[in-house]
Design a protein with these regions (language model features):
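Cytoplasmic helix-loop-helix junction between adjacent transmembrane helices
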Residues: 105-140
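Conserved MFS/SLC helix-loop-helix module at the cytosolic interface between two early adjacent transmembrane helices
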Residues: 61-100
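Helix-loop-helix hairpin linking two adjacent transmembrane segments in secondary transporters
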Residues: 136-188
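Extracytoplasmic gate region of multi-pass secondary transporters
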Residues: 30-31, 214-258, 262-265
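Helix-to-loop junctions at the C-terminal end of transmembrane segments
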Residues: 62-75, 267-279, 364-365
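A late C-terminal transmembrane helix in Major Facilitator Superfamily
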Residues: 334-369, 376
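Helix-breaking motifs and short loop linkers at transmembrane-helix boundaries and internal kinks
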Residues: 42, 74, 95-100, 247, ...
Length: 397
């Protein structure tokens, strides 16, 4: 019986890894595809904020409601439906003739992504440790690394951003089929090992209203808003910065943009090995200091290769931050509020993904692309300050 349970857990972990690879792929596509998309639809540079906002609307809605959805449908059913929804949205991007229809499909893709993200994060935070959380998010990094590469190949060979989205859409549909075939495994309950077994985060039934009244919950959500906003901003705007003002060719810029996600992935793999030994606070604080230095180097740009060095440094530095913050949710807000807070944090990531890159796009349009690294430095420095505030609050609690 124990062997069967162990095999089931291993299978679910592998599927979770694959799901996060697929989840990361679309996030890596947009930054490289955007110059071609805006020319195709004759729209301004900062119109990307509209698409991001639409995606976030869907993402925030499904992530906030992920708890009730999983309780009613089961984890496997939610994941299967969500992957199919994401695949449909991405495929739709390639078929619509006008911009506003692509924006509407952004909501569809966001609905799918939000439920996958929140559901898997809650499941892993409840059942596994910090090391596995880092490895899970490393698989997301693999997906985001593959995204720019797939899109660069599509643009270089057939000059078609639509091909890149169709390839990634196919991955989403295949994954949806995998979840359908393993529904029984996801929905199976573990047998209780005794009345003194520690409660999992999902065992607490704290009302959402009570959770929302906790100031520390909102402070925790702010961390995710700032972090994911900065992470997605660099992924979204690196390519445009390199080809716009740094004189880098599109093919090389695509590879450099991919280097951000590559070092990002390597960083999470390394963190997965050392996470337990180093501890959450050191991972987060060290990563944020490295990110501030990397963003400053990107802005300084003393020689051409420094852009590549800066992007790679930021990717490696911020790699462990998101999973470490996710694993530390219970420590920051208390176990009673952790499950609800995770859903709120995932909603905050969606909001940050739309607001911060969109604002940076507005600033870049009104001034210069060179304002991008300045904005990143400010956001990372603010995030470091907010995190230190939460650490001090924990110490006083």
């Amino acid at each position: 019986m124990n062997t069967l349970r162990k095999n089931r857990k291993i299978s679910l972990v592998i599927l979770a890894y694959i799901a996060f690879i697929a989840l990361g792929m679309p996030d890596g596509l947009l930054g490289v595809a955007w110059p071609s998309i805006r020319i195709n639809f004759s729209i301004p540079l900062d119109a990307i904020g509209i698409l991001l906002a639409a995606s976030v609307l869907g993402y925030m809605t499904s992530s906030f409601l992920s708890g009730p959805l999983i309780a009613r449908m089961g984890v496997g059913s939610v994941l299967a439906a969500s992957c199919a929804l994401t695949g449909a949205g991405l495929l739709g991007y390639t078929l619509v003739p006008v911009w506003w229809m692509m924006v509407l499909l952004g909501i569809v893709a966001g609905l799918g992504a939000g439920a996958i993200d929140a559901g898997l994060n809650t499941y892993v935070a409840s059942h596994f440790g910090e090391g596995l959380m880092q490895w899970l998010h490393a698989s997301y990094g693999i997906g985001v690394t593959l995204g720019p590469i797939i899109m660069t190949i599509a643009l270089s060979t057939l000059n078609s951003w639509r091909l890149g989205y169709r390839v990634v859409s196919g991955f989403q549909f295949v994954l949806a089929a995998c979840f359908l075939l393993t529904l029984a495994m996801w929905n199976q309950k573990d047998a209780s090992t005794g009345s003194d077994e520690p409660k999992r985060l999902t065992d607490y039934k704290t009302p959402m209203g009570e959770t929302l009244r906790q100031p520390r919950v909102w402070l925790s959500a702010l961390l995710f808003f700032l972090y994911v906003g900065a992470e997605s901003s660099l992924g979204t705007w690196t390519y445009s910065l390199l080809i716009g003002t740094r004189g880098i060719s599109p093919a090389v810029a695509g590879l450099w943009a991919g280097s951000y996600w590559a070092t990002f992935t390597v960083g999470r793999m390394v963190a997965g090995v050392f996470a337990k030994r180093v501890g959450i606070n050191r991972l987060v604080q060290g990563g944020l200091v490295g990110a501030v230095l990397g963003a400053a180097l990107l802005g300084w740009n003393p020689f051409q290769a420094s852009s590549l060095l800066a992007v790679a440094l930021i990717g490696f530095a911020i790699a462990p931050i998101f999973p470490a913050l996710m694993s530390g949710t219970s420590q920051r807000v208390g176990p009673h509020f952790a499950a609800n807070t995770i859903g709120l944090q995932m909603a905050a990531t969606g909001f940050g993904t739309a607001v911060i890159p969109g604002l940076i796009g507005v600033f870049a349009r009104r001034s210069s692309m060179e304002i991008i690294p300045i904005c990143l430095t400010v956001v990372f420095a603010t995030l470091l300050g907010v995190y230190l505030l939460t650490v001090n609050s924990e110490a006083k609690a």
